[in-house]
């Protein structure tokens, strides 16, 4: 809903402010804490996911289409959440909630997937489960274009091709991930000497000695 103070924002060949947001919304899937905070604890997982087809949160007033219900179930299975359709939001772990949010974001088969710090607040096990799920999504040849926001290299899944590094609200580097997430770039961005490594498809950064 934010608009720039100067310039234009173009998303999927549409200019914000010159396009009907209700037409644009189904083309973009988003998972963020802002959405999660709007979900009632008593809401069932199946309703949370399938209601994305109508761009609402929770139970829709109309009967669900069988195809939508089946897609929601398939997405939950893909997220490793088999048998959780009737679980309520308030009974889920933090990691399970994050994966439900991603299933919901994929419900409309979007052209663009936005993930705003999806691993924030997760313990080690929850993070690794999430990274595994995201790696499967990002390496799928039919996956939508995706943008992942994170402060931690360890959360970057396989399949990421490009990176943009920001510091103090400004872009300091952008380009192919291998030439952008370097020790030099990240040391400058974080203001301390860092050693960056990329081993077995996973990124890591530690203090340089």
Please give the residue ranges for each predicted region.
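Conserved ABC transporter NBD signature motif
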Residues: 7-18
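H-loop/switch region of ABC-family ATPase nucleotide-binding domains
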Residues: 150-151
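ABC ATPase nucleotide-binding domains
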Residues: 187-209
